[in-house]
Every structure is written in C-alpha cells, then in structure tokens.
From Swiss-Prot:
Motif interval(s): 'HIGH' region: 32-42
HAMAP family in the cross-refs: Cys_tRNA_synth
Highest taxon above the source species: Bacteria
Cofactor note: Binds 1 zinc ion per subunit.
Localisation: Cytoplasm
Residue window of motif 'KMSKS' region: 271-275
Gene: cysS
Species assigned in the record: Cupriavidus taiwanensis (strain DSM 17343 / BCRC 17206 / CCUG 44338 / CIP 107171 / LMG 19424 / R1) (Ralstonia taiwanensis (strain LMG 19424))
Quaternary context: Monomer.
Reaction catalysis annotation: tRNA(Cys) + L-cysteine + ATP = L-cysteinyl-tRNA(Cys) + AMP + diphosphate
Name this protein carries in UniProt: Cysteine--tRNA ligase
Biological process annotations from GO: cysteinyl-tRNA aminoacylation
Length: 462
C-alpha cells in the first residue's frame, strides 16, 4: 500500500489514513439532488472524489464507493408540479443527464448509487431508534424533529458551539419545534402534495427529511462505522453535522473516521449564483471546452482550495493538456503499467500521498513530458501515460485529442484537410506565398501544421 495522509475535517489536521479493515476502504460521498442539470460545482465534486477513488485503488486498496441520489425533496416536488409531470418522470430524466455528464468527465460509476426513495424503510427504522432514545420527538405540526441539544457531540465537525449557532442557519425557524436548532427527520404530508411524495409511517403520512436520507443509506450499504465520508464544503454544516448526530445517536458508535470536503467553485472571482448571472451547467461548459480539459482544470487545483472558473483558466488548462498529449503523439509506450520504483513515479506517489496534492503530482507529468521531448524516451512515455491514467487523464489517442479540441468558431476537420491539400498543391506549383498564406490562415484559426519527412502534414488545434 502507498502511504497516505489525508486532511480530516473532523480533526482539523492531516492524519495517516488507517482503514478500519486492512486493505479495504468504505467511502460515501453526498451526490446530486436530481431536479435540474448539474452545474460546475457538481462537476468538481464528481471529479474530485473520482480522483480519490482512483488513487485509493492505485494505492492498492479494495474500495467500496457509494454516492447517493436525492430523488425526493421540496425542490423536486415543486419542479414536477410546475412541469405537470410525475416526480418519477422528472428524476429519471435528470439522473440520466447526470450520468451522461459524469461519463463525459471521465468519472467511474460508483459501486452503489442508492436513491433515497428506495431506502425509506431504513430511514423510518433509524428515526424510530432516535425517538426511543429520547433524541427525536413529534411536534404539534406532525413533523418528527431531532432534539439537537440532547446530542452531546453536536458541533464537533463544524467547530460550532450551540451558543454560537444562529437559529435558522439553513434551518427554518418553526414555532412547533422545541428548540429553533432542532431539524426535521420526517416531514408530515400536506394535502396539496402529490401522492407519490408520501409514505405511511407510525407518525402519519409524510416523507423523510434531507439529512436522514444520507445517514440511512450510508449505514445500510457501508455499515454503522466506515472509513471516509466526502462532499462539498457547503455540506459541512448543517448537513454533515446532522448526519453525525443522527447516525451516532441511533447506533451509539462512531459514524465516520475521516471527513473530506472539497472547496468552493467561484466564477471570475465571484460566488456562483443564478442571481449574478454566472451560473453554468456542465453541458454549457462542454459546448465550449473538451471534457478532459475541464477535468484537467479541476484537478490542477488542490481539492480543498477554492477553484476559480474563468475562460482564461480553461484556455490555459487546454494549452497545458495539449503539451502533454503532444509529448505522447510520436511515442509508442507499449502499455501504461507504472514502474513505482522510478524517481518520477516516487515523486508522484509522494504528492498524492500528501492529501491528494494533484498540483504537485501534475508537475511531475510535465517533467516527464519534457524528458520525452528531449530524449524520445519510450520508458518516460509509458510512465507519463500510466501516472496520468491514475488521475483519469491522457487515456485517449493523442492525435484524436490534438485534432478534436473544442472551438466554437474553428474550422472542421474536413475544412482543415481541404486547406492542407490546397497548401500542398500550392507548394507543388512552387507558389510558396500561397502556401504560407494558407498556413497563416490556419494558425489564425488556432490550427498548427507540422510538416513531416516524405511530404505528409499533421495538424493539431493550438
């Protein structure tokens, strides 16, 4: 096993990773609420934890990776009613779109993708245990709430004391609650809501609260105590704090050993929001940029750092990824098995073992590319392809990538080939001024030509 230190939000420090069961890792990541297209913030969660999943496997661990799907909540109900469709029709469609976006970004499908609606019995069972222990109560409005002040460890993940917590922080104040900080476990049904949003329970018809869904699904699939729980930094409080209160309150055991949170995504140094008009879906971004460029851009930043999205940064990522593919285009690595005793691989593994430090790890890839360009080393090409593969990068044929870069206004491959043929004809007629004009025209359109021995001409997008 490669040594691994991971920043644990719960401990507020990097810690050596020691799995509960030697050689095996059980990991849960909070997934999407499926009522709309995934945005660039979702893309970061997908890619970051796919990177973690891939590296854990490369480091020799047997990984069970669970990422849930929230397919019932207020926003989903509201959107389905607005659209005049069933909840199932809405969520099935957006689950498909989510899978398409994830596949485009090179994300390996998790081992389990539990849907909240399939685990309502487990949620009711957990709520019953909490009520039996005096940690939950049914309020006068019919909701079942968690009594926050009765759980001694509340606030240990976020570092918030009960005195410091503001009533209503992402939790609406409700007169029926015994305490403003209490949160809902079971929402009583309203007459105006569609029948498919309601389940029977001993507390009356209703549906689960957001937080209980993840507690029940993670414990059902990974056990009451597992290794890693991840998600975006925005979920640290209250969602993950509430998960701890629910899961540990119900089981009496530690819930998760290590909590990971990826940083926020900003758009041109501003918070991403629909009101600011800087809200981008993955699909919108992929109209302008190759999906591997987007993945490269996300991994170029450390997962805990803020990620600033801008066209300039995406363009820079495209040029950088092009450099790596260009180094591989004339090589025949003959496989991509990594020699982990080789110095570049050791540096790469050290970086990844230091809290998944992808910026340092990726600098090793550029060192290898420089060596390939300098020496033509097949061994270096094999290392470059193999190490990049552990990040889900450089897995395509180099010529396919170099000729397929996204460009909204650029010429098509057919148009490029016609211009190359015209240039070749001009050279044959010794009309070098016309040949130079065509080369300049293509270069202005972002197409770089490279003349090869024997008269062939290769091209790539700049």
């Amino acid at each position: 096993m490669q040594p691994l230190n991971i920043y644990n939000t719960l401990a507020r420090e990097k810690q050596p990773f020691v799995p509960i069961e030697p050689g095996k890792v059980r990991m849960y990541v909070c997934g999407m609420t499926v009522y709309d297209y995934c945005h660039v913030g979702h893309a970061r969660v997908m890619v970051v934890f796919d990177m973690v999943h891939r590296w854990l496997r490369a480091a020799g661990y047997e990984v069970t990776y669970v990422q849930n799907i929230t397919d019932i909540d207020d926003k989903i109900i509201r959107r389905a009613v607005e659209n005049g469709e069933t909840i199932g029709e809405l969520t099935t469609r957006f689950i498909q779109y989510m899978h398409e976006d994830a596949a485009a970004l090179g994300v390996i499908r998790p081992d389990h993708e539990p849907r909240a609606t399939d685990y309502v019995p487990q949620m009711l069972d957990m709520i019953g245990k909490l009520e039996a222990k005096g940690l939950a109560y049914q309020a006068s409005d019919g909701d079942v709430n968690y009594s926050v002040r009765k759980f001694d460890g509340y606030g240990k993940l976020s570092g918030k004391s009960l005195e410091d917590l503001r009533a209503g922080e992402r939790v609406s104040a409700n007169d029926a609650k015994q305490d403003p900080l209490d949160f809902v476990l079971w929402k009583s049904a309203k007459a105006s809501e569609p029948p498919e949003s309601k389940w029977d329970s001993k507390w009356g018809a209703g549906r689960p609260g957001w937080h209980i869904e993840c507690s029940a699904m993670s414990c059902a699939l990974l056990g009451e105590h597992f290794d890693i729980h991840g998600g975006g930094a925005d979920l640290q409080f209250p969602h993950h704090e509430n998960e701890i209160a629910q899961s540990e309150g119900a089981s009496g055991k530690p819930f998760v050993n290590l909590w990971m949170h990826n940083g926020f995504v900003r758009i041109n140094d501003e918070k991403m929001s629909k009101s600011l008009g800087n809200f981008f879906t993955i699909r919108e971004v992929l109209k302008a940029y190759d999906a591997e460029v987007v993945r490269f851009f996300i991994l170029r930043a450390h997962y805990r750092s803020p990620l600033n999205y801008s066209d300039a940064h995406l363009d820079d990522a495209r040029h950088a990824l092009t450099r790596l593919y260009t180094a591989l285009k004339d090589s025949q690595p003959g496989g991509c098995a990594v020699d982990w005793d080789e110095p570049h691989a050791k540096r790469f593994a050290e970086a990844m073992g230091d809290d998944f430090n992808t910026p340092i790890a990726m600098s090793v890839l550029f060192d290898l590319a420089s060596e390939i360009n300098r020496t033509g080393s097949t061994a270096a090409a094999r290392q470059l392809k193999g190490l990049a593969g552990t990040l889900g990068l450089l897995e395509r044929d180099p010529h396919t990538f170099l000729q397929g870069g996204k460009s909204a206004d650029g010429p098509s491959p057919d148009e490029i080939e016609k211009l190359i043929a015209a240039r070749k004809a001009a050279k044959a007629e010794r009309n070098f001024a016309e040949a130079d004009r065509i080369r300049a025209q293509l270069l202005e359109a972002g197409i770089v030509l490279e003349d090869k021995p024997g008269g062939a001409t290769e091209w790539r997008r700049a």
